Amino acid sequence: MENFEKDKLQAAFKAPVAKPEYDPQAEPAVKVDLSICTDEERPRMVALINRLAKSEAGKETLEIAAKAGYKFGFLDASSGDAGTCFGSLHAVGLNPVVSDDKLISTLCHESRHAGQKNRMKDIPDRDLLDVASGVRRARAEEADAQAYAVVACKQLEMQGDKAPLTAFAESQMGVGTYAVFEKSLAEQNGVLNDKVLLDAFKGWYSHEGIQDIVKQLYEEVYILKPMRQAVQQFDEGNTDGVYTFNEKLSSKDLIQHIGWTGKGNYMAGEDPDFLDGEQYIGIAERTKQDADIFFRIRKEKTGIEKDTSIDAIPTYKDKFPRRFPEMESKPAVANEAEKAQPAQESDKAKNDKILTQGKNATADKWNAILAAKHLEKLGR
């Protein structure tokens, strides 16, 4: 998922949406499922696919996603994301309000996620992994998707289509990856080889631009959010299906899945333990503090021992003020009068609600499109 924090990462949306003419008769260069596109949306999606497919890296990601059965469509305009890969729906969605130039890298990024999900379907989900394994996996997935996106955009630039790379370089989400990528490419005399792709991957973890902020934002999503959900579940008296955080994923196994390409693994010659370095595995002080509180609460409620993988993870200073209350277990409401008191909703909670509503609206939109097409086939 790209640009999930609309307020923090809004620079990706600054470019005005172009209004080009799309060929209604054009067919996609890669045979993909466009069943969740309306007749009006289809020409634009075909144009985006065909533009990305002119790059070797872009075409590869599209072919893998298509082979895995992913559909391609546009998100509801209320979505806060530039693009999203819905593993559960087997769908890649793009935000229609974002410019075509920016959507090229987004399409590559989300298609790469589709391939990752397909290759890693036998690996435990992030919510089941211990904290250290979850951090490695989530960050590596984003770093790999961004690395592929910048390579695809560079390949297009080499053919004269410069706008996608410019849009990528100017987006806050792309700054770290792009800076390291261009430096490595120059050192390799302009040859786009595995070393450049690996360096672009590592660039996602750099301290360029807002990358340190991005890391902590993701920690709130893939570490703290499921923990908060579990605490809420405990407070409701339910301990069934609690997040266990006990499955392990080694750096070696992760790299074997993440670094795959049609020509081999671009990380094959790299010691996988680099993912355990402080820059790669470190988490914010607040993340560790809240996680420790969660494990204490969980032990009290369920008897499950703490996930000790978090103890060895180094920490860095928080990059922005606290947006959530401190992790805590709240006692059940004592009486009806207290129940009647309206809860104060934080700005972050309001933003999360908007994003959730946008995703629900997207699912409703796609279901409506599929239903209408089904009825049309039936002649109704």
Predicted features by range, described:
Residues M1-D7, A11, A145, M327-R380:
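Non-Sec secretion/translocation targeting segments of pathogen effectors
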Residues E182-E338, E345, A372-R380:
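Pan-zinc metallopeptidase signature
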Residues I104-N118:
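Active-site recognition of the HExxH zinc-binding catalytic motif
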Residues R44-A47, E56, K102, T106, ...:
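Extracytoplasmic/secreted proteins, especially bacterial periplasmic and envelope-associated proteins
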Residues D130-F168, Q172-M173:
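Post-HExxH zinc-binding segment in Zn-dependent metallohydrolases
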Residues V92-L107:
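Short pre-active-site segment immediately N-terminal to the catalytic Zn-binding motif
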Residues E21-S88, D100, D311-E328:
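Auxiliary, metal-adjacent structural segments of Zn-dependent hydrolase domains
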Residues Q116-G134, A138, R380:
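Extended, hydrophobic alpha-helical membrane-active domains that insert into or remodel lipid bilayers
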